[in-house]
From Swiss-Prot:
Top-level taxon in the UniProt lineage: Eukaryota
Residues reported to bind Ca(2+) 2: D111, D113, N115, T117, E122
UniProt GO BP: regulation of signal transduction
Keyword Metal-binding included in the entry's annotation: yes
Span of domain EF-hand: 24-59, 62-97, 98-133, 145-180
GO terms, molecular function: calcium ion binding
Xref: Pfam families: EF-hand_1, EF-hand_7
Family to which the UniProt record says this protein belongs: Belongs to the recoverin family.
Protein name: Neuronal calcium sensor 2
Length: 190
């Protein structure tokens, strides 16, 4: 029973876990936590809050579809909320993770049904969501439709032609093709 209106505290266990499993210092973790609790006083982020934040970054498009996939990937315990630990682990991977870590994270997002592989339908759904989020300023010519883009990706990556991408095929394919890596991880050239 806490004091009414009191904000959740960062536990020592979570702090130690995040120090060991992220590239953030203790001070940075505490600073991130302070901002997180300020924005999410209940100590977790709902899907609705998450979508609202994403919409602010992509005002000309429809971010809801893509947000569903990103939210699912952040929410590793499938609680329907993103707690601070899940949030900071995802921020760490997406902002300062190795290429392999970023690709593993992207793979989990693309693997919509969670079966450990990505099929062409899953790839198309993600590409459609990305196009919707980016909005009308991104020209979607017939040559660059989600279906054609997915087919091109599978032609390059599906080594054994079983119509599914394993994590290894996905990572190896992206590491071998810088353009695909940038597209599939939303990585921008620095």
């Amino acid at each position: 029973m806490g004091i009414k209106g009191s904000k959740p505290k960062l536990s020592k266990e979570d702090l130690e876990f995040l120090k060991k499993n992220t590239n953030f210092t203790e001070e940075q973790i505490k600073e991130w936590y302070k901002g997180f609790v300020q924005d999410c006083p209940k100590g977790h982020l709902t899907k609705e809050q998450f979508i609202k934040v994403y919409k602010d970054f992509f005002p000309s498009g429809s971010a809801e579809g893509f947000c569903e996939h990103v939210f699912r990937t952040f929410d590793t315990d499938n609680s329907g909320f993103i707690d601070f630990k899940e949030f900071l682990l995802a921020i760490n991977v997406t902002s300062s993770g190795t290429p392999e870590q970023k690709l593993e994270w992207a793979f989990r997002m693309y693997d919509i049904d969670g079966n450990g592989t990505i099929d062409e339908k899953e790839m198309i759904k993600i590409i459609e969501a990305i196009y919707e989020m980016l909005g009308p300023e991104v020209t979607k010519s017939a040559d660059d439709s989600p279906r054609k883009r997915a087919k091109m990706i599978f032609e390059k990556m599906d080594v054994n032609n079983d119509k599914e991408l394993t994590l290894k095929e996905f990572v190896d394919g992206c590491l071998a093709d810088k353009e695909l890596f940038q597209i599939l991880t939303n990585e921008v050239k620095k």
